């Protein structure tokens, strides 16, 4: 197919490619940007985003979350953030969680958090770009971008507009999900964005009575996907009702467990001492 010169919706490299990169405002400083993506919804991508931000914050890094899931935002709920966004001159001030994570989400701009966002793709992508350029991100070591599922307008906008240093791909054990995850991995490869690793959510369930592990959603294909693309497996999250309860109650910053440590170590390696 011939070139339409619409570079904003194209993932191919060519000599006539336009520069869609967006610059931060002069007040902001963000050292590293990590995208958290999934091929489909319902795999726990926002949970993983929250756990990554908290894990890095516990290591002493300054963290932020740009909630790019405009039509399905859940980050404010997970962190117990309710206050509306304020402005400082021409820039917006992100909300700050109990332990210091900066958060920008469309839910913090709506009159009611239950109000739907009924926008077309280009408008949604534009809003995500503004969350990068028009927010005062103060001295952030690691920003995590909670992407909407799939490979549509918003992931393309983020990959083209933001200086993404790498992505974490979230999946679950089901075979169909594994196939869709490969689409997300291949999109990142097409866009020359490094895939830092894979995280499998709902990997196994440990019976509280007998202590045996059960593969509730079937046998995992994670290792085969990782081997095919030469990507490390960074974490396997167990099914833990406590984690779901903490997401719902806004206390994700209080989670316990070391299952995210390999992922945190991989991300920390991006920032020289």
Model-assigned labels for residue ranges:
Residues 62-63, 68-113, 125:
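Phosphate-binding loop that captures ATP/GTP phosphates
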Residues 25-31:
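Phosphate-binding P-loop
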Residues 30, 41, 67, 75, ...:
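Residue-level signature of catalytic and energy-coupling elements of molecular machines
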Residues 110-158:
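Phosphate-binding/switch loop-helix module in NTP-utilizing enzymes
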Residues 1-19, 185-273:
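C-terminal lobe/tail of nucleotide-utilizing enzymes
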Residues 32-70, 185, 191:
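Walker A/P-loop phosphate-binding motif and the immediately C-terminal alpha-helix
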Residues 104, 128, 147, 160, ...:
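Glycine-rich phosphate-binding loops of nucleotide-dependent enzymes
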Residues 155-176:
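Inter-motif core of Ras-like GTPase G domains
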